[in-house]
Amino acid sequence: MEESLWKTERVPGDVKLAIGRAGEGPDPVVCLHGITAQHRAFNAAARYFGPSRGLVGVDLRGRGDSDKPESGYSLEAHATDVVRILDYLGLQSAVLAGHSMGGFVALKSALMFPDRVRALILLDGGWPRVESTPSEMTEEERQEAAALEAGLARAFKRLDMTFESPEAYLDFWFPGQNLKMDDLPRDLADYYLYDLGEVEGGYRPKASRVAAEADSPSVSSTSPAAEEMRGVGCPVALVRASQGFFPGSDPLISDEVRDMMAGPLDIRTEILLEGANHYTMLWPEYTRVWAPEVFDPPFWSR
């Protein structure tokens, strides 16, 4: 397999963070992944736009090759880590791109540290916090909550599993297809390989279940409600997948939720990826659709 797109480094601190740099641009976009993922989720973006734009991919605490403490997980902790990374990189401010939970981290960073965040790219993440109690939820809100819970349950399940080979890990994600790593596009294969660490008896996902289970309620309880989003003072690009976690499922950000975001946020660019789901939107065929609309020219300078 070819050399990695990323040059990896460690950001010092009480919780050491792994980052990857793609390209040498002086103003890189800082990329934040989902709740059980890692920075290689942005491989396609790094391949197509790293050389010209410059990207920094982050392994959030508890994921990838970053440290995995037993406690200390929350949106606030991740936002503080983002600023620590900017300090390490010598950046006074940066554009943040966040997929899934990474979108919530990006929003929290913009609210907590407005002078450090110049623009946000929300990739199927960062929707408003639901303020209704379960008994007050509409039927649509209940269905959305159930779909989110089902998607997270599948992602969390693998964190307790040991796989005898990388191919067995692919069987978890693509059941019945008998795939080998060589069958996948190179950037996707690299994502799955980096996602695994060797353990006794085989391979295990690097993401910490403790981290994921702590961050999940933090997202649902401390992310901004629609009105609180008015505190985000920077321009926003919103990229949505037309499907949720599973093919054919309802999108995580529906048209109604999008309308709730459009009022308080300064959304300069909006893209709906027809045919993409929450995961495949980062694959090459869809990255080639949304990334030029965001980066070429940069939406925040239009």
Predicted regions mapped to residue ranges:
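Conserved HGGG/HGGXW glycine-rich cap/lid loop of the alpha/beta-hydrolase fold
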Residues: 18-71
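Conserved hydrolase catalytic core segment
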Residues: 52, 92-138
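Active-site loop/oxyanion-hole signature of alpha/beta-hydrolase fold enzymes
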Residues: 56, 60-97, 138-139
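A catalytic-pocket lid/entrance helix-loop region that shapes and gates access to the active site
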Residues: 123-163
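Conserved alpha/beta-hydrolase catalytic His-Asp/Glu region
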Residues: 157-214
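Conserved serine/cysteine hydrolase catalytic core
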Residues: 194-263
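Catalytic histidine neighborhood in serine/cysteine hydrolases
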Residues: 262-275
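Post-His helix in hydrolase/transferase enzymes
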Residues: 276, 281-296
